[in-house]
Amino acid sequence: MKKCYALLIVLVAMTFTFTFPLSLPAADYKAEYKLSTVVAKPMPWGIAGERWAELVKEKTAGRINIKVYPGVSLVGGDQTKEYTAIRQGAIDMAIGSTINWSPQIKELNLFSMPFLMPDYKAIDALTRGDVGKELWKILESKDTVPLAWGENGFRELSNSKKPVRKPDDLKGLKIRVVGSPLFLDTFTALGANPTQMSWA
């Protein structure tokens, strides 16, 4: 199976490592590479995708052109299908999310475990240490080449009905969750009424 290049964003600062094989002859490059982002352009991931595409074009003297497709538009707005589309070659690379890829790569559910990490320092230690390396090996075994970890902040809870200060405040509250069974289970256990909806 063809290797896919993916940029995996875990949890807004991004550090990119350029790893395309620059020694390939021009004939081996596609006219355009498709970069999927889960969110729209004005969001940090969208802005980062656009900037990265510009830098790649600049650093390769125009040999590599990347077009950014925001809002998981290449998979009809369903972020849970992004990883499958990468594996099938419909998407060349992505600024993706472990939440969205966890239905296909169960080990990525680690980052969706409620209250697992107390702060950014702990999550950075996890992704930069042995656990992060092991997760990269798992991704590589599935023909995906991760380039960097990034962060999107800790899970937050917001709604338009009432303040949520303690778990009991969630009882009966209708709340949108991403397409991860773990999120559905977590919010159900907390007494909420979760509904799966895409970000896009």
Go through each PLM region and give its residues.
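Bacterial N-terminal signal peptides
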Residues: L8-F20
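N-terminal glycine-rich cofactor-binding segment that shapes the pocket for flavin-like pterin cofactors
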Residues: A31, S73-D78, I91-I95
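Extracytoplasmic "Venus flytrap"
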Residues: K34-R51, G71-G76
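Contiguous mixed-secondary-structure segments that line small-molecule binding/active-site clefts
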Residues: E54, R87, D92, S97-M197
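Short helix-initiation/N-cap motifs at beta->coil->alpha
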Residues: Y69-T84, G179-L182, P194-A200
